[in-house]
């Protein structure tokens, strides 16, 4: 049971990493505008 949960968490992390990169660019743009 734990091994399957770890695989699911790893797949979620990969999707979060792509969204985090996009959010980081958004935050950088907001700070530069300030």
UniProtKB/Swiss-Prot annotation:
It comes from Pseudotsuga menziesii (Douglas-fir). This is Unknown protein 5.
